[in-house]
Amino acid sequence: MSHVVRPILIILASVAIYTKYYLSFQNGFIDLLSTMGSQGSLAGLQDGLRSHYTGLDPLDKFLKACNVFFWPIFHGTSPALSLYAIAFAGSMIPMWLILLMHTCVKSSIVEIVMINALTGLLVQGIGPGVMMCVLLAMRSTSMEEFAVTSIPAVSILGPNDLPLSLVVCYILPLALSSLPAPASISVPSKQLFIASWQGWPLYIALAVGIAHSLRYGYRRSRPQQLFRHAYAFALACSIISHVGLLLISFLSIYPKSPFLSLHSADLHPQSLLVPRLPWQEVKITSLESGVLRFLHWDYSISSTGALLWCYDVYWEDRMRGKGWIAFFSLSSQLATMSLAFGPCSVALALYWTALSKNLMKNEHVRKR
């Protein structure tokens, strides 16, 4: 299937460029972002946009643009946008973990840190809709190298190091950025938190490197045990955020629902869960609607690409083991599970099924 999946991933990346960037120029979203940036305004505020962060002008301009874009998400001016962003943030954890685990086979700890810092920053800066598809298209779906007798460099880490690094370097900055301003923190401080969160892939990569250095000389963990904790944590985050999105969205349509309010139309499943098709594009009149449309396509394409690639990994592994797969039956089951628990949750489960089997082979070979 790899010869089919790789071109599809490239096509998906092209669709992401078209829907996220080209159409954003056409519908006025980019112009709206530029106008707010030049005026120094934020969604819901007439002014207060911070201009200085690091002292490096190109980086400060990028972080300033990030604050204009992410402010309505963290400020909560649109409950539907914030709710959808939470689901998207939860799905990023399994997507990042898939990239990390696939790098850890034969790489040294320095290579693991550098590769994941670079690829993570590209995903954060350009967007997972484009970069996840490109990065996965560049990676082999074969699991043969996971059954080698060498011990991965990251096996020196403790089983809770990866989940802890995700909490400290990804979830905690998200939580700090979500604090209400000016009720709990000042507007400039909130913008600083939002800007700081942009570097979470670098923080996680450095945390993994530091944890490896602190544990140098310790007894190595079983790779399967190391990744199992991270897998369970990432799966829980993804499922909880996706199920929460579904529950609130579908409950909003019932007359006696606690979520029935002025925002019920925005929370309706058709508005919140389904991206507007390209030929249904309308002029963007508010920053919140433009950001939600942007996230719709980013999440839909990146999660589809991750699911497709992990399906190929699972397929290749079963075929290599001379197994048999009922294609249509499995595909329908995966589609149903993706709707219920999230496509990234299903993608991670498929990847872990293939990975854990090959890590067990690795362990059995080394014990001989």
UniProtKB/Swiss-Prot annotation:
Q: Which UniProt keywords apply?
A: Isomerase, Membrane, Transmembrane, Transmembrane helix
The record gives the membrane topology as: Multi-pass membrane protein
Query: Which pathway does this chain act in?
Result: Secondary metabolite biosynthesis
In the Enzyme Commission scheme, what number(s) does this protein have? 5.4.99.-
Q: What residue intervals traverse the membrane?
A: 10-30, 81-101, 118-138, 192-212, 233-253, 334-354
The EC class name is isomerase
Q: Which GO terms describe its molecular function?
A: isomerase activity
Listed under GO cellular component are: membrane
| Coiled-coil stretches | none
Where does it reside? Membrane
Role summary: Part of the gene cluster that mediates the biosynthesis of the indole diterpenes penitrems. The geranylgeranyl diphosphate (GGPP) synthase penG catalyzes the first step in penitrem biosynthesis via conversion of farnesyl pyrophosphate and isopentyl pyrophosphate into geranylgeranyl pyrophosphate (GGPP). Condensation of indole-3-glycerol phosphate with GGPP by the prenyl transferase penC then forms 3-geranylgeranylindole (3-GGI). Epoxidation by the FAD-dependent monooxygenase penM leads to a epoxidized-GGI that is substrate of the terpene cyclase penB for cyclization to yield paspaline.
Query: What's the family?
Result: Belongs to the membrane-bound ascI terpene cyclase family.
The identity of this protein, by name, is: Terpene cyclase penA
The species this protein belongs to is: Penicillium crustosum (Blue mold fungus)
